[in-house]
Amino acid sequence: MVSYASIPQSSDEAHSTVGASLQLDERKQDLNNFIQRHIGPSSADIQQMLDVLGFSSLDDLIEKTVPSAIRLHEQLQLPEAQTEYAALAKLKQIASKNQVFRSYIGMGYYDTITPSVIGRNILENPGWYTAYTPYQPEIAQGRLEALLNFQTMIIDLTGLEIANASLLDEATAAAEAMSMSYGVSKNKANAYFVSHDCHPQIIDVLQTRAKPLGIEIIIGDHQTFDFDKPIFGAVLQYPASDGTIYDYRAFIETSHAQGALVTVAADPLSLTLLTPPGEFGADIAVGSTQRFGIPLGFGGPHAAYFATKEEYKRQVPGRIVGVSKDVHGKTALRLALQTREQHIRREKATSNICTAQVLLAVMASMYAVYHGPEGLKQIAERIHHLTLVLGVWLQRLGYTITSQSFFDTLQIKLGEKPLQEILEAAEAYRINLRIVDTSTVGISLDETTTLEDVKDICRIFAGTDELPFVLNVQEFDWIIQQSSLKDEPFSRQSSYLTHPVFNRYHSETELLRYLHRLETKDLSLTTSMIPLGSCTMKLNATSEMIPVTWEEFGRIHPFAPLTQTRGYQILFQQLEAWLGEITGFAGVSLQPNAGSQGEYTGLLVIRQYHQSRGETHRNVCLIPNSAHGTNPASAVMCGMKVVAVACDAGGNIDIDDLKAKAEKHSHELAALMVTYPSTHGVFEAGIQEICAVIHSHGGQVYMDGANMNAQVGICRPGDIGADVCHLNLHKTFCIPHGGGGPGMGPIGVASHLVPFLPGHPVLESGKNPQNIGAVAAAPWGSASILVISWMYIVMMGADGLTQATKVAILNANYIAKKLAAYYPVLYKGQNGLVAHECILDLRALKKSANIEIDDIAKRLIDYGFHAPTVSWPVAGTIMVEPTESESQAELDRFCEALIAIRQEIADIEAGKVDIQDNSLKNAPHTVESLIVGEWPHPYSREQAAYPAPWTREHKFWPSVGRIDAAFGDRNFVCSCLPMDAYN
């Protein structure tokens, strides 16, 4: 009840009271800022952890950790931090400047309908999007099953034998197919045929990839190509970019006679109606699953696919999910054939792909699960029938259709009709068409197209709202009969998606429960911290994620006119400027759509720079032994020769060895690839000297930005001496890992390298003759998820970003300090401190207790934790990165788990516990192993299942026991097994 006495009696008094209350409200708002939501430890926690480390303040810690010569002494020039509400409102304003037209541009991108049950329960669900790549398969069976469904879907639709678990985009997949063909072809040719009917972005990405490898690209007509020059491979579009469906069998037979491999870039939805590539002789099929319920997003992210013959299984790029079994004989899934991946094969790898598009592959697979084979076919038939209607009506209006065999795309000759007149009418109807040339336009229909949309398109060409025809049943039936797809050689006769998983979950209730069952099999950030070194598994805040699903960002075609994408342009300009400020670089490209692609792009820019100066001989890339495996793989892709540089006993680059190698290769030195802080988790004091050595020999310094979470606001790559740096936005800038993608890997470059940044054939900016060409299918890569990083920077501001870096370093040092008495910290920087991660040395445990690194990783699952990075960068170690988002309580739980495990090992060392039959060797423990049959082990069920107090409050149960990796590789299966195999 309000007392009258409390009401101000004068206007002055009222004014002062209102002012005070407003100030109070502002103070409350400040207390509720996003920075405190993002950073896990409270102020009291931070002080307590500093006390443990013996420091009075965070600044004191940073002063002792980061070399003074490289520290940034000025605040970053970034916008002031905004609340979540204010940031969302500001971004909504920007989004409103995008215009959502009906886009019938095609070229591999189509509007689609994301089933609400998939959007809400996968795309918007942190249980799916905050997980990591399934390197610990026992706690990743859910998304591994979803990815196996994806692979099965692709195998069935393409008619090939094996498929991987996604690639970055269709153009990149085509480039990977070219590289694989080059590697396995035995005819020694170095020319690759590219059909001129491929999408322009595919052709451009292939040209970019081919140039440094010395591959000659021959662009031509497959119908007239006479094979006068030997080729090792070819790529064909199916259907062609202009919509035409060709019979490619004769071309493929002739190619095979030469020993060449043929890749078909195929639209997977069309394959529900068309003869699959595998059935007419294709060796490889690639494409995009974007139209399987994944929003356009102005170019991405989308899951590409890659399918081929089983004989090439060890040459396939990217990850493959395979079927194996666990220790109890139960069917279990894992990543198969991992020894072919870049992090193991390094410079011998044929691909540098690491992060792919797992989250989007899961969505696409569930789209197929939800609709089933009949549902997909109905969608495809409906699109095709509407395209037939459109074609007939346009012909009746006097226009010429260039092809009589098509699925969803038409090209129309305008005749005497001016192109500008068509475009102005289309704009009035808020419709986008593909401009092929001054007298030709293209139209691609999609799942969202209605008959009324078709009428609107016809009104554009008729020049009037009144159409001279009506569609009745008889007319419709007659038009459908005109389809060439019902006849050989185009009509698909083989069945597909016959596995029960594609025929069981067609009601929303059933799919919802299936998705939830899979989700609960996986450990994500919704369960506990994921302390993977070099992975930065920080908070992916809900406010950062929400805009991804806004229509203003999601329904924009990547080749829509720039006049319709003002909002995106503002977003890009701001983000490029902020990332440039954070890194100290003059220019930024947002096109690379993964960290691996950022590396590749950065090195291509360096290569192009040297060539522009007439120094084509510069092709040696120095890489420390400790580098990420993608580094040497990327260098080889850029036509460079890798020369390894040694590390000293402290884990730092051996500067004497670096100087010797730089001197030896001075004439041909192109670049040094260096990670900072180092992959050993320390700030190397000699980093500026290292950069100076390379520059003195005419080389450029490429800095791997994987560890940028320890630099933001404290030091900058450009100031340190780097010429190029890629950023993992899915690490430092909060884009979630998605269980193995999406990622984004933009690069920052010094001013002298700006002219060489990527271009794109569909944009005016792509016509700069100095640029390296396109490295991704879309001009700004996976544009729609850039809103996540934009939101993070806006809500954190300069102070918040810097504080996050400091706390990330604090958390890592706190863990190192707490665990040092139990596990030696392998490398430390100056003053005995680590950067944002630390390496714990477990090598002695093999000798003392017969304990392998894997035993500790699997036992951590029983405690409810994902293992840190295992056996990298040093075999027999674990690398821990807690990030700034984890609270002190969570750090303490993790430390207590590792300390308890060390005690279990001590019991083995003391002979109290059997060296073979113990809680580590048998980990992880499933519910079934605990309750079914006799308990044969010398330790209790309680110790197995509830080794720590918090596991009684909330227990994460692995769905399978330890998986037999070797069995899965010996008995390679990468598609769904019969359902009884899971029982």
Swiss-Prot record:
Pfam families listed in its UniProt record: GcvP2_C (PF21478), GDC-P (PF02347)
UniProt entry keywords in alphabetical sequence: Oxidoreductase, Pyridoxal phosphate
GO cellular component terms, semicolon-separated: cytosol; glycine cleavage complex
A molecular function (GO) term: glycine binding
UniProt-listed GO biological process terms: glycine decarboxylation via glycine cleavage system
Superkingdom of the source species: Bacteria
CDD domains, sorted: GDC-P
Residues with the N6-(pyridoxal phosphate)lysine modification: K731
Reactions that this protein is recorded to catalyse: N(6)-[(R)-lipoyl]-L-lysyl-[glycine-cleavage complex H protein] + glycine + H(+) = N(6)-[(R)-S(8)-aminomethyldihydrolipoyl]-L-lysyl-[glycine-cleavage complex H protein] + CO2
Subunit structure: The glycine cleavage system is composed of four proteins: P, T, L and H.
Function: The glycine cleavage system catalyzes the degradation of glycine. The P protein binds the alpha-amino group of glycine through its pyridoxal phosphate cofactor; CO(2) is released and the remaining methylamine moiety is then transferred to the lipoamide cofactor of the H protein.
PANTHER family: GLYCINE DEHYDROGENASE (DECARBOXYLATING), MITOCHONDRIAL, GLYCINE DEHYDROGENASE, DECARBOXYLATING
Name the record gives this protein: Glycine dehydrogenase (decarboxylating)
Organism: Nostoc sp. (strain PCC 7120 / SAG 25.82 / UTEX 2576)
